[in-house]
């Protein structure tokens, strides 16, 4: 797509198309039938935090709880996570990684980093950092936007 074409697209449409393309690109690198890139992102988030509840995952990844719950159920079915009730609030479910998930993250993460590095190399480090800053600015604007 040329820059002129990009300027004629709305932000929502262009971001959704780009997101699908990037998701497919990362899926090629992962090359894993057991887990999607979205589920891998969840595993990495839980890995970084030790354990999280569904609300924390949804808030951090800016996803609705239904989508998070659906993916968590798939991850549990594949043996990647364990779910326990919170000691202080029985309504909350605490999500933790299993040894199988730690192994999966260790296996996929280098491929994930390679995929990201190739994108950064393609557009250049300076443009890539600027792109990430713009995305963060848009996210912040939308998160706090009130009509």
Model-derived regions, located:
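Short capping segments at the starts of secondary-structure elements
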Residues: 49-53
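Short, locally clustered residues in the helix-turn-helix/winged-helix DNA-binding domain
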Residues: 16-19, 44-48, 109, 136
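N-terminal leader segment of winged-helix/HTH proteins
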Residues: 1-33
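C-terminal regulatory/oligomerization modules of transcriptional regulators
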Residues: 1-7, 125-147
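Pre-recognition alpha-helix immediately N-terminal to the DNA-recognition helix
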Residues: 21, 25, 41-44, 103
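Key DNA-contact positions within bacterial/archaeal DNA-binding proteins
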Residues: 38-40, 66
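Charged, amphipathic alpha-helical coiled-coil/dimerization segments
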Residues: 73-133
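Residues within helix-turn-helix
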Residues: 54-55, 66, 73, 93
């Amino acid at each position: 797509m040329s820059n002129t074409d990009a300027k004629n697209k709305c932000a929502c449409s262009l971001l959704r198309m780009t997101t699908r393309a990037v998701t497919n690109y990362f899926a090629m690198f992962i090359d894993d039938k057991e887990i999607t890139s979205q589920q891998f992102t969840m595993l990495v988030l839980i890995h970084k935090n030790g354990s999280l509840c569904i609300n924390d995952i949804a808030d951090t990844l800016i996803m609705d709880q239904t989508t998070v719950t659906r993916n968590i159920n798939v991850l549990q079915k594949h043996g990647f996570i364990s779910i326990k009730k919170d000691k202080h609030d029985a309504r909350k479910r605490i999500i933790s990684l299993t040894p199988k998930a730690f192994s999966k993250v260790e296996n996929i993460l280098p491929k994930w980093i390679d995929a990201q590095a190739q994108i950064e190399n393609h557009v250049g480090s300076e443009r890539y950092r600027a792109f990430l800053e713009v995305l963060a600015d848009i996210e912040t604007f939308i998160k706090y936007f009130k009509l």
